[in-house]
Amino acid sequence: MSITVNQIVLHQLVKNMDGDSIKMESVLRDELLSITPEVEQMMLQLHQGYQNKAKAFGVFQEKSIFAQHLNRLLEQEIEFLGFSQYSTKLLADELGKYNFAESGTLILCQYNFLATDYLFIALLDSRHSMLVDEHLDIRRTEYLDITQFDIAARINLTDLQVNANSNRYLTFIKGRVGRKISDFFMDFLGAEEGLNPQVQNQCLLQAVSDYCDQGELNKEQTQAVKKQVFEYCKGQLSNGNNIELRELSDSLPTLNEQPFVVFTEEQNYGLEESIPPIRSTLKSLTKFSGSGKGVTLSFDAELLNTRIQWDPMTDTLTIKGLPPNLKDQLQKALQSEN
């Protein structure tokens, strides 16, 4: 699938030391980039890379300066270039407050994908490498790293304009180096956390468990329902889709003459109609897993009290019938000791 790039520009943030303090300077383009096949290919790669990142959701705060200028852009009161230049200066001021600030190239792009308009913002690093020129000489070169980036956000402009009460129109990358990366970018955007997918997934799992309990299902029936939920969610995850609560409900058996979606509404679980799936959380529908003190365990939930017995009094698990590869390793270890 391709994307349609409408407007795109690059600016630079340059780190300078002013005594003991950091000062970020803005180097601004005075015109937008021409939309060439190379530019479209770059944005497609950035779009695909962003899709695969772990993201959190956010919403603009009431006094967000960035949101005010974005609204002026959407109302066509200002041009995209002026908006991008102001945003770059705003980010430079915010980034200068942190000692981890580094130089980078800021990209702002307004594009369309699957009938949805987006504004993509990312701070990209430059990398050094070598190239062979036309004379077969080795020269140093510098390139924009569009495969590895941790500082980025995307605004669903269509959702923002159509649904004023949305809590998921803004997404940003959850940085691996700690909250500080996410925090400064959220401060720059004037945003706060919106939808929490982790909480939504956990509430969904609890609702499924409670639904089975109130339906007075036995262990086997409960496991069958949970497996059905997991298979649906796994399918949505594989296709890049959200969990649609009503669609999920329609696929499940009706218990006590009450559909699952009605049960969740009456019990006030606070579930959204559409929930971003989280694989690690959903796995607990059909598996038990855990790790600690050098031990990692994972097994199908249906094996509990059959092949696997748990004694809470002695805090022990008894496994009947070890996996062949594990048994083989243990036998080899025993032989080497003897």
Swiss-Prot record:
Family matches, as InterPro entries: Nucleoid_associated_NdpA
Superkingdom of origin organism: Bacteria
One example GO MF annotation: single-stranded RNA binding
Keywords: Cytoplasm
Main location: cytoplasm
Cellular compartments annotated: Cytoplasm, Nucleoid
Gene Ontology CC: bacterial nucleoid; cytoplasm
Entry's family note: Belongs to the YejK family.
Protein name (Swiss-Prot/TrEMBL): Nucleoid-associated protein CGSHiEE_07855
Native organism: Haemophilus influenzae (strain PittEE)
Lineage, top ranks: Bacteria, Pseudomonadati, Pseudomonadota, Gammaproteobacteria, Pasteurellales
